[in-house]
Amino acid sequence: VAVVLGVGLACLRQAVFQALESAGPRVGVGLRVLVKPNLLTARPLACAAPEVTAAACAWLLERGARVEVADSPGFGRADAVARKIGLEAALRPLKLRVRGLDRPVPVRLPLPEAPEGRGARFMVARRALECDLILSVPRVKAHSQMLLTLAVKNCFGCVSGLRKALVHTCEGRDPDYFADCLAALWAALPPVAALADGVRAMHVTGPSRGRPFALGLIGASPSAVALDEALCAVLGLEPGRTPLGAALERRKAEGCATAGWRAEYPLLRPGDFDARGFELPRELAHTSFHPAR
């Protein structure tokens, strides 16, 4: 089930609570939840708004969850990015702080078309593997390599630190193969729910140097895959047109319409939003990791 909610900048907390109450994950007392923002860089629009992440944490805490907020940027420290964008201050009243996704362990990721016993091998943060639920909190952004970066792509931050740069360098030249690796990583993690910040999206290029686009939505779902498909619908894009969407369809991932899932929209529907003018990259960059992009 996915929900998309129209929202203005002045009522983010209310919008986040409404979205999560309508179509958020089931949360019980003591559930260990890793809230995973995308702390890529402190550049404008690169991360979800601090108020969105903090509101999600407040909603989880009110339901008795044990909440941690963590990420692992490819370069630099998560807490440093959080401080610069105001997330550290936004979390302080909740007595939460941003941690790094370190202590990596090797995880072998079987790929659909690879020979049996072969596949990718990622070094994944132990904290991400040991929680009960991950709540992915991305901003809706164009991406020069993956076309879009949404909730499932945000899971790549569970690969520790500079190891992401190594993966990009080794696998990033082929977007389809890299997308298969990302889909396999999502499948290896605990259940991934999602809350997407699309109030001010990023378009034209990304994930860090695109232009702002007033999309005006917050999206939530217990399934990161289902939310990504709903956001593609908002943008008038078939999920399979993105490398990662196609990889998830090949895997018949739970949450894909092609696997038999049908989204229900208890609030607004994708057609209620006007995404005309949202520009995607004209061609994908078949290149290795470049921190300035």
What do the PLM-derived regions correspond to, one by one?
Residues V1-R293:
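N-terminal and secondary-structure boundary signal
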